Curated annotation (Swiss-Prot):
Residues 266-301 are annotated as: Important for dimerization. This is Oxygen-dependent coproporphyrinogen-III oxidase. Its EC number is 1.3.3.3. It comes from Prochlorococcus marinus (strain MIT 9515). One of its GO terms (molecular function) is metal ion binding. The gene is hemF. Keywords: Chlorophyll biosynthesis, Cytoplasm, Heme biosynthesis, Metal-binding, Oxidoreductase, Porphyrin biosynthesis. The active site is at residue 112. It catalyses: coproporphyrinogen III + O2 + 2 H(+) = protoporphyrinogen IX + 2 CO2 + 2 H2O.
Amino acid sequence: MSKEPPNNSREKTKNLLLKLQDNICKNLENIDGKAKFTEESWLREEGGGGRSRVLKNGSIFEQAGVNFSEVYGKELPQSIISQRPEAKGHEWFATGTSMVLHPKNPFIPTVHLNYRYFEAGPVWWFGGGADLTPYYPYLSDVRHFHKEHSNACEKVNKKLHLVFKPWCDEYFFLKHRNESRGIGGIFYDYQDGSGNIYKGSNKDGNAYKESNNIGELNLNWNNLFALAENCGEAFLSSYQPIIEKRVSQNYTKEEREFQLYRRGRYVEFNLVWDRGTIFGLQTNGRTESILMSLPPLARWEYGYKAKQGSREDLLTKIFTRPQDWQNDKVLEEFCLENNIFD
């Protein structure tokens, strides 16, 4: 089967991502039980547009944003040209659905999802992923999230998750803090079926090493479309059980304050390091939609240090570091001993 996109590639990916947005919003409204999404449709002067949906002040979600966009133009931003110079001079098309959920309860993690598709002349690729940012450490929740996304990847190829997991650890890393944004998940970009899976720049990282060991997988357009479809569908099964397990847990003012403090790291990553934010701002995207990922409340505290051995301390020391969450028996024993397994 040809690796090249079908003639209806743009319409097909657009419809997939619209359906993903609709499905997520419908289910999140049912889960929350109180608030509803409001929708704003918008147009981009240079070409394209989208629809932004936001749910605020729900029973579970303090804020939830689910965006769809379909944009196109003639002038590519420098961030794309530097990665794929052969795209220069071609008209381009990009579509994507992105989501960030900020729950009220500190025991329910923040979650992020993004799946996207890009074309410019002979150049095309899929990208995407999902990642979890807990504020309090529970290894069982982390394992469940990773397992669901591992299963979704393996439906296309059993080797994909071996690269996408460490690639996610690498991408969602705050270099200025020397810590991960959360416990990771999956991340992939520039996937067009050619070359090795890993397309990042860190040749010292585990994603690069795993990708080199695996070699080329010869995936075609349909395989990569199915990957986006499978992973998008895995979101609810990866996250809803965590909500159901944690939503009835009472929390203190201090635990809420720690959640807001850790949300500050989320803000720092999105404004300083996130390529999607940078791309959106460089291409004159809709600013309100681009910054929808930011939490409604966050706080910073100079020189904060958690009490040694506290759950806040264990979150900071262990759950902001890349780990083999699913298979590390030493980590499992440590979490059981310190009451942070379940």
